[in-house]
Amino acid sequence: MSKTVELARHLDTLHINNMYKNDFYWTWDKTDDEIDAIFTVADALRDLRERNKSTRIFDSGLGISLFRDNSTRTRFSFASACNLLGLEEQVLDEKKSQIAHGETVRETANMVSFMADVIGIRDDMYIGQGHTYQKTFMDALEEGYRDGILEQRPTLVNLQCDVDHPTQCMADMLHVIHYFGGVENLKGKKVAMTLSLIHI
């Protein structure tokens, strides 16, 4: 039996029904089962990739990225994730869009989301603004979907805001779990995560 099949069986034991069509704003909003599921799916994708098996679940579609701050690792990770799943990344550059001419968040959010399955937003420059902007963007999409403007509502992945950086936290934690050979081996250890450094 392949590792992916074992991981899929493990997923069946988890309570994760609320994850579907649910945005990922903050790490601490997820249940233990949901965090476990994210790590399990990441390991399954890694296993498939290492065995040169396709991981595409989309035949078409867009992953929209909006970076309101500089990024290297997260930017390329999001683009790679879109590609891995079969989505084409489309970068929303605010300086080259109608946002620069005063277009509202509501108009922009709905316009760029017509064919989008996921939207990744990084807005971490100012305390009190990043998460608020992400919520405003997604509230506009919820309204657009409810009013029939959008055929589907894309899911948000927080690529860092002023409150949390869930993708970095999750990637770092999974690395630590692999390094120690399982989450159970972290019991009794002190882990400090500071910026991009982990100390154990």
Q: Regions from the language model: what does each represent?
A:
Residues T194-S196:
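Active-site donor-nucleotide binding/catalytic segment of nucleotide-sugar enzymes
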Residues R51-T55, I177-V183:
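A short, basic/flexible loop-to-alpha-helix module at the beginning of a structural domain
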